Amino acid sequence: MDKKYFFFDIDGTLTDIQTGIPVPSALETIKKLQDKGHFVAIATGRAYYKTKDTAKMLGIHNLVSNGGAALIYNDELVTNSPLDREKALALIHEADEKGFGILIAVNDSIDVVMKDERFIEQVGERQEPTRYILDKSLNYDDLKDIYKIYIAIPEDK
């Protein structure tokens, strides 16, 4: 039999969308595929730090996470690249000029930096665990790495 490659999303596919717990049918399917020698991986937009524990629960050792920027092969982190810095800064500056609240993940963790509290004022706190780091002297151009950008864009914009 030819080896096949299977990539699965997490929420609502491998785990219950409400609880985040792996569904029994997913665990059974993953095991069957792996036992037959197929390559099984997770493909998700989630950051790596939010994906690795779920992968471990599912017995999956390969991941494409962080929207394709992170690659984990046989439980080893191969790469986890930040966004293109110049494009990210252009987006951040445009959002800032328009008065939109901004949160920036500068590493692969629950930490986000912000220069003011506009994001929280405009849309409230994020629904997932987040540590907000308020730095009123934050100069976006001084940021070395940018992994994710969260922008509070009003519905009418």
Question: What residue spans do the PLM features occupy?
Answer:
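A positional/architectural concept
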Residues: 23-24
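Conserved acidic, metal-coordinating active-site core of Asp-based
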Residues: 94, 100, 105-157
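A general structural motif
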Residues: 1-3, 37, 99, 144-146
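Short, basic/glycine-rich phosphate-binding loops at helix/coil junctions
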Residues: 7-9, 70-72, 140-142
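Active-site phosphate-binding/coordination module
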Residues: 27-121
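Asp-based phosphoryl-transfer active-site loop
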Residues: 2-19, 42, 91
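Short, flexible loop segments at the rims of nucleotide/cofactor-binding pockets, characterized by
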Residues: 17-20, 40-41, 80-81, 128
